From Swiss-Prot:
Alphabetized SUPFAM superfamilies for the sequence: PA domain (SSF52025), Subtilisin-like (SSF52743)
The encoding gene: SBT
Signal peptide region: 1-20
Name of the featured protein: Subtilisin-like protease
Active site: 141 (charge relay system), 199 (charge relay system), 524 (charge relay system)
Occurrences of domain Inhibitor I9 (ranges): 28-109
Alphabetized GO MF terms: serine-type endopeptidase activity
One biological process term in Gene Ontology: proteolysis
Species of origin: Petunia hybrida
Role noted for this protein: Required for arbuscular mycorrhiza (AM) development during AM symbiosis with AM fungi (e.g. Glomeromycota intraradices).
PROSITE patterns: SUBTILASE (PS51892), SUBTILASE_ASP (PS00136)
Enzyme class per UniProt: hydrolase
Length: 734
């Protein structure tokens, strides 16, 4: 139960020391040093000796292997070592020393979603992209479950010749042509890369699981489970346990993945916002894009509050979470005849249809309101339906366990106001339904209106076709971007609510079956959807850069739900740019976007100079000596979106697009009206006569009249006979 609640929705970044570290006084530091000469850099043994030379004189030669836990080659010039504070001070005096930072511990942040995203077998984009055949997706996670049917290598090609990875399973577990690499990077653990938590198995199968018939949870959501890129290869790098994910281990895994030859990196984990030179995911991701490796990462699960994002660097695709159109419906039926639809994956056929006494202990006890462990013991809930509030730092499944332990017959889980109307189909331990905020308030009002409230739960099973999808989940972290306000984040949203995918064990306590699946939610689930889609795009367009692929995903994103109305948030209000980014991913459109915005490595360096970072700190990120002789502001980066702070003076920004659509084509600009801002684009028409031809345009922003909102949003779109290329705009008015 604990594993499910930890990984279904990740919580805040945590910092802690292990027991061993406390007892020895040593802590893990990530040490950055100057680059040695090329000869030393090219020889692994010489590089190790160079790193060892930075250790304090008090560290004897025999201690070195136990002190240095990771040596970095691609993502950083430096190493991770166990050191005391005094030893770090001694190292700071050495020539070539740059910095030493304490490791941070980060948190982990489909039978139907391929079809929901327009992917169908033997036709369309899936067929055109060859299902991602030959692309290698590297995932940094809790490990993987070899032998699960989702990781069968039926119809899989052999790994590409470039692959240099390792398989470190023990016993009878092995790699195959689907799982082509699996390694453990949790320092000091000595465990194989098998998955004890479930999170890594779930994300890996979401990204690239093979076709598995009759996948379901408790008989619900039944269908063929398959990942986004079913013919892509998987490489798992185990960096997380139930204690979290050390960024020193993450950096080591990124280092290895780059050397192994992955094509896509998928990171369903993150922490707080930091300057990029303190953010080891940003540092490792930059090393990856230097090699043409795409990096996709989850936005975080701290929504709907603003500025709660993780993974904000512009060279990372930052992914928020959306709903899809399938629900596993469980309806709360009240004694007054009112009914309120909710969700639950556990739907027992033998639950009686009779109404039972209904109670809400939270009226008099806050702990009991959240149904924390033991909080119901002083209440008479035996044989009753118990209302529990969502939140209170108590996992949803823990709440149902509390009700069961106290003798309750069923649970109605009610959202708080901040949660809005989004619900989850969890595998509860007793009959239950999860209802939205409005329904929860009506149910509590009914309880207060009568001395004998009663309720039951009517289980309706799996229903597909909810037209209000996609919508933004309440937990999905929101912008604005704190680390770089001039870059819109998240970049994109994708399915992350009630995602069915592979699981190491049966959640139904069944034995003798390997068809083990679970339904969980989080931006951790959205990220591998996008990682798999990126694998499809890499297969279809092997010459596209990471920035070009990101541009294609963003500029082709959907703005509407299945009803043709604007995408909504958890309050059923139109979602803003800080919730959706560019919009909801549309894989088929992304494969043929018409125009792309590309970015070169030098552009990123000028952008980092424009952030005002010290040259030494930029060098840590980009792994080369930097002289900031020229710089650009954030809004001048050739990004597929705009985020500006606009005062009284007009601001002008240029963008350059590359034609990847019809060779001969003409695009005309359309400007969505933005309150308080006049937007002018010149030229208003772009004409192309050949493929890969480039064109540059300028956008002018000017305040116009009074404004009531500090943040306003809009968009510019370039339209031809075949394409619409859209860039969202955020303006902060001052």
């Amino acid at each position: 139960m604990t594993c499910i609640c930890i990984f279904s929705i990740a919580f805040l970044l945590s910092f802690h020391l292990t027991t061993a570290q406390r007892s020895t006084g040593l802590q893990t530091y990530i040490v950055h040093v100057d680059k040695p000469d090329a000869q030393v850099l090219a020889n692994s043994a010489d590089l190790e000796s160079y790193y060892n030379s930075f250790l304090p004189a008090t560290v004897s030669g025999s201690e070195v292997p136990s002190r240095i836990i990771h040596s970095y080659h691609h993502v950083a010039t430096g190493f991770a070592a166990k050191l005391s504070g005094e030893e770090v001070k001694e190292m700071e005096k050495k020539a070539g020393f740059v910095s030493a930072k304490l490791e941070k511990v980060l948190t982990l942040h489909t039978t139907h979603t391929p079809n929901f995203l327009g992917l169908y077998q033997n036709m369309g984009f899936w067929q055109e992209s060859n299902y991602g055949k030959g692309v290698i997706i590297g995932l940094l996670d809790t490990g993987i479950t070899p032998g699960h049917p989702s990781f069968s290598d039926v119809n899989m090609p052999s790994p590409p010749a470039k692959w240099k990875g390792k398989c470190e399973f023990t016993g009878n577990a092995t790699c195959n042509k689907k799982i082509i690499g699996a390694r453990n990077f949790i320092s000091g653990s000595g465990v194989p890369p098998t998955d004890e938590e479930g999170h890594g198995t779930h994300t890996a199968s979401t990204a690239a699981g093979n076709f598995v018939n009759d996948a379901n949870v408790f008989g619900n959501a039944n269908g063929t489970a398959v990942g986004m890129a079913p013919l892509a290869h998987i490489a798992m790098y185990k960096v997380c346990s139930e204690d979290g994910c050390s960024d020193a281990d993450i950096l080591a895994a990124l280092d290895a993945a780059i050397d192994d030859g992955v094509d896509v990196l998928s990171l369903s984990l993150g922490g707080y916002s930091d300057p990029f030179y303190y953010d080891n995911i940003a540092i490792g991701a930059f090393a990856a894009i230097r090699k043409g490796i795409f990096v996709s990462a989850s936005a975080g699960n701290d929504g709907p509050l603003n500025s709660t994002l993780s993974n904000e660097a512009p060279w990372i695709l930052t992914v928020g979470a959306s709903t899809h159109d399938r629900k596993i419906v469980a309806t709360a039926v009240l004694g007054n005849g009112q009914q309120y639809d909710g969700e639950s994956a556990f739907q027992p056929a033998d639950f009686p249809h009779t109404l039972l006494p209904l109670v809400y202990p939270g009226t008099s006890d806050e702990e009991a309101a959240f149904c924390s462990s033991g909080s119901l013991d002083k209440f008479d809930v035996k044989g009753k339906v118990v209302v529990c509030d969502r939140g209170g730092d108590v996992a949803r499944l823990e709440k149902s366990q509390t009700v069961k332990d106290a003798g309750g017959a069923a649970m109605i889980l009610a959202n708080l106001e901040i949660d809005g109307e989004g619900t989850f189909a969890d595998a509860h331990v007793l009959p239950a339904t999860h209802v939205g905020y409005a329904a929860g308030e009506m149910i509590k009002s009914y309880i207060n209106s009568t001395s004998t409230p009663t309720a039951g739960i009517l289980f309706k099973g799996t229903i597909i076709g909810f037209k209000s999808s996609p919508s933004v989940s309440s937990f999905s972290s929101r912008g604005p971007n704190l680390a770089s306000p001039g870059i819109v984040k998240p970049d994109i949203i994708g399915p992350g609510v009630n995602i069915l995918a592979a699981w190491p064990v049966s959640v139904e306590n069944k034995t003798g079956t390997d068809l083990t699946f679970n339904i969980i939610s989080g931006t951790s689930m959205s990220c591998p959807h996008l990682s798999g889609i990126v694998a499809l795009l890499k297969s279809a367009h092997p010459d596209w850069s990471p920035a070009a692929i990101k541009s294609a995903i963003m500029t082709s994103a959907d703005q509407s739900n299945l009803e043709g109305q604007p995408i909504l948030d958890e309050r059923n209000l139109p979602a803003d740019i800080f919730a959706t980014g560019a919009g909801h991913v549309n894989p088929s459109k992304a494969s043929d976007p018409g125009l792309i915005y590309d970015i070169q490595l030098e552009d990123y360096i000028q952008y980092l100079c424009g952030l005002g970072y010290r040259e030494k700190d930029i060098g840590l990120i980009v792994q080369e000596t930097v002289k900031c002789e020229s710089s650009i502001s954030e809004a001048e980066l050739n990004y597929p979106s705009f985020s500006i702070i606009l005062g009284p003076k007009t601001q002008n920004y240029t963008r350059t697009v590359t034609n990847v659509g019809d060779a001969s084509s003409t695009y005309t600009v359309n400007i969505a009206k933005t309150q308080g801002v006049d937007i002018v684009v010149e030229p208003a028409t772009l004409v192309f006569t050949k493929m890969y031809q480039q064109a540059t345009y300028t956008v002018s922003f000017t305040q116009s009249g009074d404004f009531t909102d500090r943040f306003v949003q809009g968009a510019i779109s370039w339209s031809s006979n075949e394409y619409v290329v859209r860039s969202p705009i955020s303006v902060k008015l001052e």
